[in-house]
UniProtKB/Swiss-Prot annotation:
This is Large ribosomal subunit protein uL3. One of the primary rRNA binding proteins, it binds directly near the 3'-end of the 23S rRNA, where it nucleates assembly of the 50S subunit. GO terms for cellular component: cytosolic large ribosomal subunit. Keywords: Ribonucleoprotein, Ribosomal protein, RNA-binding, rRNA-binding. Part of the 50S ribosomal subunit. Forms a cluster with proteins L14 and L19. GO terms for biological process: translation. Belongs to the universal ribosomal protein uL3 family. The gene is rplC. GO terms for molecular function: rRNA binding; structural constituent of ribosome. InterPro entries: Ribosomal_uL3, Ribosomal_uL3_bac/org-type, Ribosomal_uL3_CS, Transl_B-barrel_sf. It comes from the Bacteria. Pfam families: Ribosomal_L3 (PF00297).
């Protein structure tokens, strides 16, 4: 069965296993998510569970949003997302961190850090030219096809805005779950800046 939860990235730290091995982990704080709506094939055309995370101040919420969350008997939420193919949950139910356990393999989605306008070396990992005195090619994007096609090729790597994209890292392992602090520790790093929204789901390719 698919499992999922929304949380906020706190930062990175490190833990030690019983064997003394050091593991770098990302700390995700996931306070209880509330089920706001259950979608079915009959009514919506697909099966999904809509969950809300992080209470929003009453002043910042409008009447339709308040009416929507009132059915779940909860406060307005800052983040609302859907998880498909989750069964056995009703409106108003809570999803907590102990839904997952240490050793579970998950897919983690977040918004990568925005880097602004960057050149091709930083943005695409291209190699630079010689830095010698006689060289006239240092950090340029390279050939634009000026002779034969008389145009710039489609998908040519050029400078532009970097980061700020939705990124999913697959098959990350949960190192530890701390229910009393609503915290999940995930091995390695996950996309996004501190305090950014993180989506944790059961890995799609875990059994393959």
């Amino acid at each position: 069965m698919t499992k999922g939860i929304l949380g906020k990235k706190v930062g990175m730290t490190q833990i030690f296993t019983e064997a003394g091995e050091l593991i770098p982990v990302t700390v995700i704080e996931a306070t209880p998510n509330v089920v706001l709506q259950v979608k079915t094939v009959e009514t919506d055309g697909y099966n999904a569970v809509q969950v809300g995370f992080d209470d929003l101040r009453d002043v910042l919420s409008n009447k339709p949003a308040k009416g929507h969350v009132a059915k779940a008997n909860t406060a307005p939420k800052r983040f609302i997302r859907e998880f498909k193919n989750i069964e056995g949950l009703e409106v108003g139910a809570e999803i907590t961190v102990d839904t997952f356990a240490a050793g579970d393999v998950v897919d983690v989605t977040g918004t990568s850090k925005g880097k602004g306008f960057q050149g091709v070396i930083k943005r695409h990992g291209q190699s630079r030219g010689p830095m010698a005195h006689g060289s006239r090619y240092h950090r340029r994007p390279g050939s634009m096809g000026p002779v034969a096609p008389n145009r710039v090729f489609k998908n040519k790597h050029l400078a532009g805005r970097m980061g700020g994209n939705r990124v999913t890292i697959q098959n990350l392992e949960i190192a530890q779950v701390v229910p009393e602090k609503n915290v999940i520790l995930i091995k390695g790093n996950v996309p996004g800046a501190k305090k950014s929204l993180i989506t944790i789901k059961s890995a799609v390719k875990a059994g393959k």
